[in-house]
Amino acid sequence: MNKTGFIAYMESIDLAPKTIEKHVKFTKQFFARVKKEDIQVTKPDVLKFLEYLKNSRKLENKYRSDFLVSLNHYFTFLYEEGTIAENPCWFLKIQGTNKKKLHKIYTPEELDQLFDNYYLLFVRNYDDSGKHWREHSKIQAKLAKERNALILSIFINQGATTDEIRKIELDDIDFIKAKIKIRGGKKLNDRFIPLKATQIGLLMNYLQNIRPQLLEYQTTESKKLILSLPATIKTTRNDNLFRWAFNALIKQLKSIDKQFINFQQVRTSVITNWIKTEGLRKAQYMAGHRYISTTEKYLPNNLDELIDDINKLHPF
């Protein structure tokens, strides 16, 4: 066990001293039990150890999960420094330890359907004839819905956060390479994500027909791709400029799909789908994660269902 390197790794990801101490302690107990070198440890070894904690030490799932977290950190450290080719803790999770309510994870097809339904209902077939609005209010509402369709498209296809969507600039779009730059921040890296073919037309329409009209409502010239309207321009805080727009879009999506919660749910779905189609490393880049351990949290997990299959393929 590379204790010194492990501690340095955990310090680099800002874990608390007591947490580091616990992870070292639990990892030591694992190696004392399995009696193998780092590179020799396999998934069945981890599963067998977790079964030992359950059957011999009579530990509850919560404490077994703590051991698994420690081991996952250690093998992630070895994976990132190139010592091992695969983390044996990938896809493992103790059943019954997650107390958070699980929300729906959308498939790529379901995300596309969510966008199509929004576009048909609120853009293409939207009827405001029954609205007793002034003409300029109807124009603003139409512009907002066209803009929100583009926002939703970026959420669904690029997996961006709300803050990242605010920061996209005109120069971040490369039509020749069919890519868009997503600007990160303190916690996320910059990355270039491919544009889907269906997004090209949406972007062209927005840039040629919608954004110029939105620009008329701005007090200064802007390089931002997404522009706000008077209802949100009046806010005194820049970080609140799009809150009204995002909240309105959430409300509209909830009216379409009762299982829709928020945009974090969409991002979680997108990253989960990337892992399945692109692999863990590429998904890490596309999500903007600085550490592979962050991406690993999106892996589909269920330890108890895996044990029998692993036993059949890799006998202890």
Identify the residue ranges that each predicted region occupies.
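Conserved catalytic core of the tyrosine transesterase superfamily
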Residues: 1-316
